[in-house]
Amino acid sequence: MTDTPNQLPPWRGSVSLDFELAADGTTQWQGGARSPLKLLRHFTAGDGRCVMPLLHTAGGLVGGDQLEIALHAAAGSRSFLTSVAAQKIYGSRGRSRVQPQGRWAQITLQAELEAGADLEWLPQETVVFAGALLEQQQQITVAPGASWLGADVVRLGRTARGEDLGAGRFCNSLSIRRGEQWSVVERLSLEQEQLPNPHGMGGEPVLGTLIWIAPEPLENEQLAQLLKGGRADREGLSGTMAIGPLEPGLIARYRGGSSQAARLWFFRLWRRIRAVQGLSEPSWPRTWPFQEAELALNPEPATTATTAAR
């Protein structure tokens, strides 16, 4: 079984951005993008933070496509990056006797933060279609005194259409180093037959992770209040949600059936993290689903679907 020989060559999209603190207290950027990735018009938030939306003009990836994102945040800079829409990973191509499932799509993120930098990476969710193969790699280097906030939400299959992952597979590699020490090192590989495992996805199609590497260790009472508030923020949301300490910072996990629930919870956590740092409260990003903004700020009453892991 082979694909037709007249296929278009795979995409090799990339973004490279450097953020620097200007004399007027705002964060300026330099860099560029290669199609199909595109930088949309940035704006400066009230606290001088550079807000940069990224657009994937091709609408999605197929097997063999690659996206590379490289970020550098200089000392004192503040930046927030998000995506305009969900990232779609379509069924693989390039099938052959050697690669019967086809070729993999690849997304790579590399970020380097200097001391005193503050970088927030909160893209919209990734949707892995049936039969798609996605390899995602994230390598983050955080200098002591810098703050990194990153979130990742992935849906395995278009469940609203009754679709599961099928012959597809999702692999994720995440490493975060703070100074000379590793804060997070994770390797994840999921395929359809593993999803029902109660010790894994428990039959749920959506997983999400939010990690905050704080610039300095939090006081015990401060951390306890942050975690307590984060657990209260689960109110009204479906799925299993857990939050715990990370040295220094926190890590939050979502497993459930709703990417919206994961996004709303992570936004509420984002507000609390900003408050702990004494920074301005974040606004609901302009490129996110606008109809969810009210739910994010005003939680509905708790439902029986909410599961608090810890």
UniProtKB/Swiss-Prot annotation:
GO terms for cellular component: cytoplasm
Keywords, in A-Z order: Chaperone, Cytoplasm, Nickel insertion
Gene it is expressed from: ureD
Top-rank taxon: Bacteria
Family listed: Belongs to the UreD family.
Keyword Cytoplasm: yes
Location within or outside the cell: Cytoplasm
GO molecular function, one term: nickel cation binding
Keyword Chaperone: yes
InterPro entries documented for this protein: UreD
Protein known as: Urease accessory protein UreD
Function description: Required for maturation of urease via the functional incorporation of the urease nickel metallocenter.
Binding partners and assembly: UreD, UreF and UreG form a complex that acts as a GTP-hydrolysis-dependent molecular chaperone, activating the urease apoprotein by helping to assemble the nickel containing metallocenter of UreC. The UreE protein probably delivers the nickel.
Organism of origin: Synechococcus sp. (strain RCC307)
